[in-house]
């Protein structure tokens, strides 16, 4: 069993042995630090995704996409920073006495991730700052495919089509910007 928690904590639990192991990409406790001071920026609910083509391949995301082929015993970074990396939105939050930097306020992260169930190595990443990237070569190169005119927003989910490798759907929200309208996008290329 695999599970994640705030600040990028990722654990693996053996039900048979009743043992838990930390398999975090960046095993650090950044509580109290602003996001710009962290080596990796993880969203409170960061993606943990297994490849539909090979269940020994696992992905997770910070501002980077990470891949493991050994149940998290080691990780390989397969992307650059796929966010806007706006450091003005990565400062410590909270008051002058108590800083509230537990992970939920971390911004400029990859919020959603998917691998095409049709084409092995076609990977989709969406950030909480409104960018969508795709790789068609297993993470070697990434292309920004953010819809033209999309303002800063949170890419809530990307769903790769189960029928066509070039098709994906994205649900986008801007509630943090005072905009409650729904945004839905589809690409076929």
Predicted regions: what is each one?
Residues 1-189:
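Beta-propeller blade termini and top-face loops
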């Amino acid at each position: 069993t695999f599970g994640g928690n705030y600040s990028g904590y990722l654990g693996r639990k053996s039900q048979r042995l009743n043992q838990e192991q930390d398999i975090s990409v960046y095993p650090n406790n950044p509580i109290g630090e602003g996001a710009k001071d962290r080596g990796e920026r993880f969203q409170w609910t960061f993606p943990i995704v297994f490849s539909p083509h090979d269940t020994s391949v696992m992905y997770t995301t910070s501002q980077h996409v990470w891949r493991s082929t050994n149940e998290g015993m080691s990780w390989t970074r397969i992307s650059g920073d796929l966010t806007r990396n706006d450091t003005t939105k990565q400062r410590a939050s909270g008051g002058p006495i108590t800083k509230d930097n537990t992970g939920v306020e971390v911004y400029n992260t990859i919020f959603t991730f998917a691998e095409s169930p049709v084409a092995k190595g076609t990977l989709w990443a969406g950030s909480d700052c409104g960018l969508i990237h795709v790789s068609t070569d297993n993470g070697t190169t990434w292309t920004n495919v953010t819809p033209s005119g999309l303002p800063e927003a949170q890419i809530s989910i990307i769903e790769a089509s189960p029928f066509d490798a070039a098709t994906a759907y994205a649900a986008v929200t801007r509630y943090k910007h005072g905009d409650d309208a729904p945004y839905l996008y589809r690409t076929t290329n």
